[in-house]
Amino acid sequence: MLYLHQFLKLSTSLFIALILVAPTAQAAKHVNVLLYHHVSADTPRSTSISPDEFAGHMAYLQEQGYQVIALGQALSLLQAGEEVPDKSVAITFDDAWRNIYTNGLPILEQYNYPFTVFVNTDPIDQNHRMAMTWDMLRDMKQRGGTLANHTTDHDYLVRKADYGSQWLADTLANIDKAQQRLEAETGATPKWLAYPYGEYNNTLKQALKERGYIAFGQHSGGIAHFSDWQALPRFPAAGMYSNLKTLKLKLASQPMPIDYNALPDPVIRLDQDHTNPPVLNVNMLTKEKKGVRDQLSCFILGSPQKPVWQDQQNWHISAEAPLPSERSRYNCTAPIWGQKNYYWMSHQWLVYEH
């Protein structure tokens, strides 16, 4: 009997030890968000992915062990400084096109993937033939979707004569009206905004922050606790960006650890003598090793451009020639020390003259 008692005691101790050393699910401190518009082979290629291509993306996420999680879950955890599952990805769509419902939703349901649709509400209210109906949106919400704000009319928000009090009041009224329509038709709606065309300025960002909104652009990169929560990036995954060979590198990347809140206003007003080309000054959150500094690379309008380091934490980059009118981006990557993956950051510019 004594031997049995000792055996049970030893077995219990071994069992507890095994639990303590057993591998646990890995966690991460960032999420990469994919951005889609149309799911169709018959719509403008620049903002479209065919149903077959979209199915290929979803299959790749599953095959490679990516954890597709609800955007709200990821945002809540990261804002609180907590971790998300390793290889976390969130799926978003802009514009509430009907082909998202007819072509995209069945594929998403095959994998039980949650997703978010940013809705511009006027086309829904006006029964636009290419937009979803309110019934479709309510159905999507019941089938794993989250609905969020994309303004009422999808108008340009910062291509205006000036950025005075009337402009800001009108812009916020537009956003508030869309929020009210979403809540009236579909119930509780998170205070998230996707900027039409990804365009914003720092005045609008600050106003949205004061009103409790989280906002998303269309520049690329991942989201972490240190991100600018009124200018969150997403990786475009349609059109020229739908190629899995390049998308897989972006999915494996991590947000570059910089002070995103200190980045300059993205609007370059030619009628107000703003500097063009603009200089992007960047402050890293940690001192970087020489190997990382030497391999930091930036691309501007498709051409490589070498940044200049002031010290171990600060660097700047500028185009060699004035940026053209419309949107441009400075995209930069750097190796993560001790890993095969890369840091990624992007800053969008809008060169505009009223």
Predicted regions and their residues:
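Metal-dependent polysaccharide deacetylase catalytic core of the NodB/CE4 family, i.e.
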Residues: 29-44, 64, 85-89, 97-203, ...
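Catalytic-core region of carbohydrate-active enzymes that cleave or remodel glycosidic bonds
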Residues: 177, 182-186, 209-220
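A short glycine-rich beta-strand->turn/loop micro-motif centered on a GG-aromatic cluster
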Residues: 71, 117-119, 215-223
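Terminal accessory/targeting
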Residues: 1-87, 109-115, 121-132, 165, ...
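Short histidine
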Residues: 147, 216, 221-256
